[in-house]
Amino acid sequence: MATPNQEAIDTFISITGASDAVALQKLEEHRGDLNQAVNAYFSEGDRNVVREAPVNDDDEMDIDDVIPAPQSPLSMFNAARTIGRPPFSLLDSDFARRVFDSDPLMPRPPFVSHPREVRQIPIEVKDSSGPSGRSSDAPTIEDVTETAHVQGPVTTQGTVIIDEESDDDIPFAPMGRSRQDRPAGSVANNNNQDYNDIEEEMIRAAIEASKKEAEGSSNPLLEERPLHMEDDDDIAIAVTMSLKSAEEEVLRSQGYKASTSEIGASAVTAAQGPQDTQALNGRLAAPSSPFDDDSDDVDEQPLVRHRPRRAASGSLAPPNADRSRSGSPEEEHASINPAERGSGFPSEWGGISSEEHDEAVMLEAAMFGGIPETGYNHLPFLPPQPRAQPRPPSPSLTAQRLIREQQDDEYVASLQADRDKEMKSIRDAEARQLEEETARKAFLEEEKKKEEEAQRKLEEEQELERQLDAKEASLPKEPQADEENAITLLIRMPDGTRRGRRFLKSDKLQTLFNFIDIARVVKPNTYRLVRPYPRHAFGDGESESTLNDLGLTSKQEALFLELI
């Protein structure tokens, strides 16, 4: 195993305040890991200072019954879980009592182990600094500030003197025999007393848990729990709901409603006697059960336990005298500080006080070299930071700012001009593109029209050629010159040329039109034939008349064309 370096040992000592041997041992156990060693040291906490005293074998206490060794709450919880029952099915009175009786860190309620006939023996315990008047066989009454497991009237006659010792001199009571062979007081066999014993146990467990929670808020080392208990959230939920159900059941049986803190406060006021034992030990007295007050003996004095107290960084303040003399539970409940009620710390800090939070932050800063930036740093506890008054800027700085602002404005104006120019060019390009598109469409339409016109003309020419071919084929044969009915017609064309042919007087005027058309000088139906003297124009309306009918009877006639 590698030996830890001196720097890790010094850091461990500076954080925990332990000795060199403890630091070396913890670092060797955790293979030189400083964080795990520090966490393990603080997790062990109270268990490192617990010392067990040897069990007196000559204890002459009468044993009525043997109470079996209880199991740990984790084993009970896991056992119930393996059976198949849900965790919250354990929320009954017996489960709550087993949980609080089995926890090694929770204080155990006292058990008066003597029968009723033996309780008349006077018990006197002297201060540890002086000699004791009794032998070592005299039993020590443990934790009589809480309620003892005794049913029925108990009359204890005798004097019990409080023995207050420091934490360094008084070992804790042995756990082995008190857990395995613990003698129980004589109890009644009827069901009513058993039920009262269960209720009394549940009340005591709830009040003890509330008191320990308030004490743990001032000293975080007293509330150190095993790691496996902190990791199991189901156990915490089960214990909380069990306490709540136990308190509600007790309150219903008593016939009134009050909070746990009110019950504890009223019980403290009722428990204070003329001797004011609460002022002697500096602690809040736990409430006594309403089922214990069956005895009317005015000379009865309470048994005071031999109770060790730890020396911690913070302790509970002694109760106020005015509050102890207060008569109403409401005033006592209002006077209890938030630390005693256990509900005065913000939930966002995990239920710890501001002092504990500051210590945790300082510890983390010492370990990691800085204050962590977390969302739960309590800013209200920081001192107010003075704000610096604003100073006027220097003239040079003002001039530089003005120049910079002018440059920025000019730059923005230049950018705007560039944007405008770019937008204008874009608009011009779009306009040109639109014009080109329009011109292209017009050109395409014009070309289409020309093509259609050419196609139409071509078709007309083709049709005209067919008609002219038909007219040429229909022309009668030209007669001979010496024939009596023959007539020669000379026609002057618009281009100045002349065309002549012999026709019969019996031929129709349409035959003359066909002869002119096949010359292909003018188009058909676009002209008229005119005789100059006497002037007479021949049109299409006279095309069916013969030449003789029209007066063209001479051997030779001259005609010309007149365009319509």
Swiss-Prot record:
GO process annotations (BP): vesicle-mediated transport
Taxonomy, superkingdom: Eukaryota
Comp. bias regions, Pro residues: 381-395
Gene3D superfamilies listed in its UniProt record: DNA helicase RuvA subunit, C-terminal domain, Phosphatidylinositol 3-kinase Catalytic Subunit, Chain A, domain 1
Biased composition (Basic and acidic residues): 322-334, 443-475
PROSITE patterns associated with the record: UBX (PS50033), UIM (PS50330)
Coiled coil (UniProt feature): 412-478
Disordered as annotated region, ranges: 210-229, 267-358, 371-423, 443-483
Residues of the UIM domain: 198-217, 230-249
Pfam families in the record: UBA_4, UBX
Listed transmembrane segments: none
Summary of subunit composition and partner proteins: Interacts with RABA5C/ARA-4.
Keywords in alphabetical order: Acetylation, Coiled coil, Phosphoprotein, Repeat, Ubl conjugation pathway
Domain UBA-like: from-to ranges: 2-44
Encoding gene, per UniProt annotation: PUX8
Post-translational modification N-acetylalanine, affected residues: A2
Phosphoserine, modified sites: S295, S324, S326, S328
Domain UBX: 482-560
Compositional bias of kind Acidic residues: 291-300
Annotated GO CC locations: cytosol
Name this protein carries in UniProt: Plant UBX domain-containing protein 8
